[in-house]
Amino acid sequence: IGGEGTSERIETQVKTALSEDGKDVFEISSKDGKPFIQGSSLSALTTGIGWYLNHYAHVNLSWNNLTTDLSGVEFPVPEVTERRECSADYRYYLNYCTYSYSMAFWTQERWEQEIDWMALHGINLPLAAVGMDVVWKNVLTEAGYTREDIDKFVAGPGFQAWWLMSNLEGWGGPNPDWWYERQEQLSKFILGRMRELGMEPVLPGYGNILPSNASEKMGVDAIDQGNWCSGFRRPAFLMPTDKRYAEIAQLYYKNLEKVMGKAKYYSMDPFHEGGRTKGINLKEAYYTIYSEMQKHSPEAKWVIQSWGDNPRKEALDTIPKGGFVVLDLYSDGLSRWEKNGYEGHDFLWCMLHNFGGKTGMHGRFDPLLNNYYNALEKYPDGVKGVGATPEGLETSPILYDLLFELPWMKREEGKDWIKRYSEARYGEKSEAMEKGWDILAKTVLNCPTPSQDIEAVICARPSLDVRRVSGWGTCKIYHDINKVREAATEMLKDKERFKDCPTYQHDIADVVRQTLTDSTYYLIKDIAASYEKKDMEAFKAQYTTFLGILKVFLIFFNNKF
C-alpha cells in the first residue's frame, strides 16, 4: 500500500491526549496543506488512515485488491476536522477454523497483506495460531515423547483448527521438518507485525489437553475424551488434581513464550463441541486453567468462545469478573448475549458469517447494522467490542467493512451507509451500484434464519435430488433469486464506467455468479420433474442449459472465484 511519494503527501501522529476517557479516538483534519490524521493509539491511527482512504480518497482496500499504488490518487485536504470515538475497546478477528479453511498455506507476503488490512480496519485483538505445531512439538519432546509419538498427535495444516480446539489429534499429519522450521519463522513474522501495528495477539493458552495416550506415556491422570463427530480421536483432558498439573501447564507456557512471546490474552475452549466431564470438578478445572495462565502472565485475560455448551455456568461462576472476554461467536445468527449478558462478564458482539469456507454470497445485513447497538443499550457495561469470527475468508467483504465501522459510527448513520460504501468501493458515486447493493442487502445478504451459507447445486455429486453438498450444509435458497438478478442488471449498467476498477470486476463477477448458481437450484428441480414425467424434449433443453452454466463457470470467471 503506497507508491512513490505517498508518505510525503499525508501527515500522521499518535496523540494519546486525544482520548479523555480511554476510548480510542481518531481525528482527520489538515496541516500545512496536507491531510493530517491523528489517533489516540497506534490502532486508532491506522483506523483513521483506513477511514480517510475510504471516505475521502475513495480507495477501498479489499481482499481482492489488497495492494494499490496511491501515487496517482488525489488526497483531498479536509476543510473541517472529523473526530470519531470508538465504542469498542476490543475489535477481535479470526476463528480457529479460519486457520485451516483459509490460511493453512498462506505465505509471509499474504500474511503481511492481511495484517495491513486488519490495521486499516481497526482490529486490535487478533487470534494468532501459526506456530502452535512448533510449540507442541517442543513441549512433547521435553516431556519425553518420541518424534513418532509427536507425529501421531500434531495435526496437519488443514486440520490444525480442530486439533487446537481439542476435537482431534494427528489427522492430516505427519508434518516434515521443513514445515516446522517454516512455521516458526512465519509465526515470528506475523506476531512481530501485529505487535508493530498496535495489536494484542490472542495466543492459544493451556486448556488441559494432552495426547490421548498421556496416561500411559507420562503417568498422569488424564481423562479420555472419546471421539468427536463419531470418528476423530480427541486429545485427553489433564485432571487439575494431578500432582504434575502445574509443572505441565508451565512447561507449555514456557515453550509457547519461546516461540510466540508472552501475551495479555489467551484462548482456551475446554470441552469444545463435546468431550467428557464425568468425574471432573468443573469449577476446580476452570479455576486451575485460569490460575496457571495468570501465573505465567499476571495481567492476562481468558478469551473463550460462546459455542456449544461453552462457557458453562461453572466457568461463569468461577472466573472473576474481568477475567473473561467471552466471544458471542454467532451474534449475527444465533446470539446468546440476550439471555443474561454472560452474568456480568465482558463479552464481544461477533459476526460469524461464514461456515466451512463456502464462497457464495450470504449474510445478515439488518442484524449486523442494528444488533451491536442493541447489545450496547442493554448491557452497556458488558459489551466491550465487536469481532469477526468467520470460518472462511474472502467472501462478502461489504459485511466486514460495515462490522468494523460500526463502533466508530452512530446508529443513525447506518441508513446511508450503503451510499458511502459504494462511493468508497468504486471511487465515485453511482446510482446503479447503490441500487444494486441496496437490493442485495435486502435479499441474499439478509438471511432471515440461522441457516448456514447456501451451497451451490453445481458443486454437489450429480443427482436429481440435491439437498446439500456437504454433511452440514444446505442448498435451500432463502431469498428471491429474481431480486439478485435485478441487482446484477443494475450493476451491469456501469460496466463500461468501472471496467478497469478491480473492486467492480470482483463484485460484478460475484453477483452474476450468484444469479447463475441460484438458477441451478430451481433448474435441477425442473430437470427432475421433466425426467419423472418422461418429457424428454423439456429434459434435454433443461440439462443443456444446466451444462451451459457449468461451462460459463469453467471458462469465463474472475480468477478470485
Where are these regions (language model features)?
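Catalytic-core regions of glycoside hydrolase
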Residues: N60, N64-F75, R83, L94-T98, ...
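Active-site-adjacent substrate/metal-binding segments within catalytic domains
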Residues: A88-T107, M118
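Catalytic and substrate-binding clefts that recognize carbohydrates or anionic sugar/phosphate headgroups
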Residues: E82-R83, W106-E109
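Ordered core of a single globular domain
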Residues: C501, Q505-L554
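Acidic/histidine-rich, surface-exposed loop or edge segments in extracytoplasmic proteins
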Residues: S30-K31, N95-Y99, I524-D526
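Contiguous, structured surface segment used for ligand recognition
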Residues: I1-A88
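Second-shell loop/turn segments in exported
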Residues: K34-G39, S100-A104, D177
